[in-house]
Curated annotation (Swiss-Prot):
Unglycosylated because produced in viral factories instead of the classic ER -Golgi route. Belongs to the orthopoxvirus OPG086 family. This is Entry-fusion complex protein OPG094. Residues 2-319 are virion surface. It holds the Pfam family Pox_G9-A16. The chain crosses the membrane at residues 320-340. Keywords: Fusion of virus membrane with host cell membrane, Fusion of virus membrane with host membrane, Late protein, Lipoprotein, Membrane, Myristate, Signal-anchor, Transmembrane, Transmembrane helix, Viral envelope protein, Viral penetration into host cytoplasm, Virion, Virus entry into host cell. It comes from Vaccinia virus (strain Tian Tan) (VACV).
Amino acid sequence: MGGGVSVELPKRDPPPGVPTDEMLLNVDKMHDVIAPAKLLEYVHIGPLAKDKEDKVKKRYPEFRLVNTGPGGLSALLRQSYNGTAPNCCRTFNRTHYWKKDGKISDKYEEGAVLESCWPDVHDTGKCDVDLFDWCQGDTFDRNICHQWIGSAFNRSNRTVEGQQSLINLYNKMQTLCSKDASVPICESFLHHLRAHNTEDSKEMIDYILRQQSADFKQKYMRCSYPTRDKLEESLKYAEPRECWDPECSNANVNFLLTRNYNNLGLCNIVRCNTSVNNLQMDKTSSLRLSCGLSNSDKFSTVPVNRAKVVQHNIKHSFDLKLHLISLLSLLVIWILIVAI
C-alpha cells in the first residue's frame, strides 16, 4: 500500500474588512438628517463610542439611543417632540430649532440641543391657545395671524381633541369680536367667515356685528345703519341703496351685515363724467343721471375692444370693386372732354 501525499498550501492573511455604509456614518455630521425624523422612526448613526453616548443623548433628548450591532453600531429612535408653542406656532415654516443658552437658531452650533415641532402643528389645534393670545398683543405678525385664522376653517384633523380645540377657538373669537370687531384678529376672523360662505358663518357675522357699540356702528357701519334721511331718499330709486350710497361703496366689506353685502354684490356700478355749464334748480326740481344706460340697444356697459370694432366695421362695409371704379372714372373723364 502506498502512503498518502500531503501538500502544504501557502498561508495568506485574510483580506481587510470592508466597512458597510452604516459603519461609515458619523453622528456629528448628521444634524440635518436626524432632526426631521418622524415619531417612532429609527435613524442609524453608525459606530458610537461609550464616552460619546451621554453627549449624543443630551443633544437629542427627544430620541432614545438604541444598539443595532457589533462595534458600537447605534441608532436613534424618535419618542417625542419638545418644541414649545411660542417657538413653533408663530411661524408656518419651522419644523425644528436648536436651543443654546436660552436662544434658538435654525442652524446647529456646538452645545445646542434639538427641539422639534409637532408635524402639522397648526392643523391639530395645538397652536390655538398661544396664537389667540399672541395675536392680540403688540408684537404679533399680522400675516401669521391671518393665515392661522384662515387655516382654522380648513383643518383636516378630525380627532376629538382637534374638534374641541376648534369649537373653543370659535367661542373665544365670537366673545372677543362681539366687544370690538376692529381688532385686527377679529377683522381677519370676519373676512374668513365671509369666505367660508355658509348659513352658520353668515349668522355668526351678523351676530358679532349687531353686538358692536353705537360708536363702532357710527364709524364703520353707516351702510348697515343708515340715517332716516338716507332711508327716505332710497324710496325714490328702484335699485338697492347699496348701489348708490357712498357709505356702502366706500365701506369696509368686513363690517357689512350679510344683507348689505349681498345687495352690494348685485350692483353694476358705472362711472361716468358729466359736464354742466349752468344749472338752476329749486325745491320742486329733480335731477337724475343714468349715463345713457337705460337703452340697452344703444349703449353697452362692456368695455370697448378697439380691434373687434375695426374688424366689425370692415366685415359690414360694402365690397370695393376696383374694376368698376376704373370704368366710372374713364366715363367721367370722357363726359368732361365732350362737354368742353
